[in-house]
């Protein structure tokens, strides 16, 4: 689980500044290089995850205290990364009610606990980079990796608005 957490945060962090470019070939994605020893990068990824993903998506198989694996203290976790609980031993639950999310986005957002493990870091990297502006979609966004995705682009302010030609 420790490497999965690090892969997830690193892939998320690396996806932010990149443009939407995915290798063609049905499931063959650009290779992401992750340095699991770069704790500062992993900590930034954890902050991005809790600020942008945990609003809608739970990670119910992960407890906040596991963030100590990437060098954070209980105090840092409580002060900067916890918004729905005060106990660092609690699981990471979304702030948004799943029923409300289903009504607003067409489906309840999936739990993200095992996404990096089941899909792989390359998929996650491509997915986060794959959002593009699509005026035909209800929320104005689509994704080259997950067509007709119900999720709006959570990191567009960091990544910029991408277009598919």
Labelled PLM ranges:
Residues 1-36:
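Post-cleavage N-terminal segment of exported redox proteins
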Residues 41, 49-60, 108, 120:
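Short pre-active-site segment immediately N-terminal to redox-active cysteine/selenocysteine motifs
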